[in-house]
């Protein structure tokens, strides 16, 4: 299966897997920007993609940025649909107490390619019951 990638900016880095067997391809910034505490910013990657049929790309945070700087992807996971051809942008948010400096060519997120199931939607008057039924939000303990 192939993922086609188009560079939109000379600073762009083609995403790659850091290690064999990794689920996520590293994504890189082409921007320099300061994200202040409590602030979110759209960071550009300078790439667009053409996904294989029946797939989506999920944009996920990098664990190191989250642990060390409290920087994460705001709309986790961000979804890139198979038919989208625009630039991939990453919305980063600073949950920390200090300003964070995004630099050009910094690893800012990861992209996981996964299969998508399409379903036929059917409106019904009643759903089947289960042992769990409507219990949620901590109903199995905290």
Curated annotation (Swiss-Prot):
One Pfam family it belongs to: dUTPase
SUPFAM superfamilies: dUTPase-like
Enzyme class: hydrolase
GO BP term (any one): dUTP catabolic process
Binding sites annotated in the UniProt record for substrate: 62-64, 75, 79-81
Keywords of this entry: Hydrolase, Magnesium, Metal-binding, Nucleotide metabolism
Pathway linked to the protein: Pyrimidine metabolism; dUMP biosynthesis; dUMP from dCTP (dUTP route): step 2/2
InterPro entries: dUTPase, dUTPase-like, dUTPase-like_sf, dUTPase_trimeric
Similarity remark: Belongs to the dUTPase family.
HAMAP family recorded: dUTPase_bact (MF_00116)
Protein name: Deoxyuridine 5'-triphosphate nucleotidohydrolase
Lineage: Bacteria, Bacillati, Cyanobacteriota, Cyanophyceae, Oscillatoriophycideae
């Amino acid at each position: 299966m192939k993922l086609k990638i188009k560079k939109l900016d000379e600073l762009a880095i083609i995403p790659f897997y850091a290690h064999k067997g990794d689920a996520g391809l590293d994504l890189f910034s082409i921007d320099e920007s300061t994200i202040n505490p409590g602030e979110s910013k759209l960071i550009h990657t300078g790439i667009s993609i053409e996904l294989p049929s029946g797939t989506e790309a999920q944009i996920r945070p990098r664990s190191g940025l989250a642990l060390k700087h409290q920087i994460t992807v705001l709309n986790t996971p961000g979804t890139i649909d198979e038919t989208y051809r625009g630039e991939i942008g990453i919305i980063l948010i600073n949950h920390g107490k200090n300003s964070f400096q995004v630099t050009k060519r910094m690893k800012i997120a990861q992209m996981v390619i996964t299969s998508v199931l399409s379903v036929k939607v059917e409106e019904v008057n009643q759903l089947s019951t289960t042992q769990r039924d409507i219990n949620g939000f901590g109903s199995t303990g905290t």
